[in-house]
Amino acid sequence: MSDSRFSTSWALVLPALLVTAICFAVPVANVLRLSFVEPAAGFGNYVELVTEPLYRSIAATTLRMAVATTAISVLLGYLVAYVIAHTAPRHRQWLLLAVLMPFWLSVLVRAFAWVVLLQREGLINAALISLGLVDQPLALLRNETGVLIGMVHYMVPYAVLPLLSTMLGIDPRLVPAARACGAGPVRSFLKIFLPLSLPGIVAATILVFILSLGFLVTPALLGGGKVVMVAQYIEFGISETLNWGIATALATCLLALVVVSLALVARLVPADKLFGAK
C-alpha cells in the first residue's frame, strides 16, 4: 500500500520537476557556465566585479535601495495589515481589495504615474508649495528619493499579504485577556501581539528584500540613469555592450544572494510558521 502511494506521489510530482528543470535549472546552469567562459575561461569576470569600482558602486546602490525599500515597506505594510486585521470581517474584504488593486497595473504604468506626480511641476510639488511647506520645487526625480518612493509603492502590497495572514492567525482573545489583567494597550501590543506576528514580519522582510534586488523598470524611469541597480546593468550588458560575461556573473551573484537569504530565513523560522500556518 505504501509503495503504491509512493509511486502515485512521484507520478504527480514528476511533471512539475521536469518543467522546473527545463524552465529554470537549465537556463540557470547556462548563465553560470557563461559567467566562467565569456569572454575567456576562468574567474576573470568575478575578479573584475570585486576590483572594478563601477561594479562595487552598483552593488552598493542595489543593496542600499533594497534595504531601505524593505524597511519602509514592512513598516507601512505592518500598519496596513494591522488595520485590516482589526476591521470587521464584512469591511475587511474591501480594504484587502484596495491593497490588491495595484497588482492590476503593470510596473511600467505605475512608474510613469510617479514620473508625472514627482516632476518639478507635478502634483506633489504643487501641493507642498501651496501648503507653504517648501519655497521651491523639490528634486524628486532622477535621484534615489524618487526611486525609493516608486519601489516602496510597488512593494507595500507584497509586505501586507504575509503580515495579514499571520495576524489573522493570532488568537483575538489574547490581547483583551492581557488588557483585563491590567496591561495597557502599548504593553499588550509589545508583549503579545508583536512577538506573535514576528513570523509574518520575517516573511514580509525576505519577500520584499528579494523582489527589491531585481528592480529594473522603476529605477530606470525614476532614476533617469543616475540611479543604476544590478538588474539595469545586467540588461545593459546583454542588450547594449554585449558583455555577456559580466552580465551573467552579476546575475549569478544576485541569485546567490537570494538563495543565501532564503536559507537564512529557513533556518531562523520554520516553514509552517512563515505565513501564519497553524
Positions of predicted regions on the chain:
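The alpha-helix within a helix-turn-helix
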Residues: 178
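A short amphipathic helical element positioned immediately N-terminal to and/or at the very start
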Residues: 41-50
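Short cytosolic juxtamembrane segments of multi-pass membrane proteins
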Residues: 268-278
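Glycine/proline-centered hinge or cleavage motifs at structural transition points of membrane proteins
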Residues: 181-183, 195
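Membrane-water interface segments at the C-terminal ends of transmembrane alpha-helices
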Residues: 7-39, 53-168, 192-216, 221-223, ...
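Short glycine/proline-centered loop/turn elements that form peptide/ligand docking sites
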Residues: 170-174, 273-274
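Glycine-rich helix-loop "coupling/hinge" segments at transmembrane-helix boundaries
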Residues: 38-40, 216-244, 278
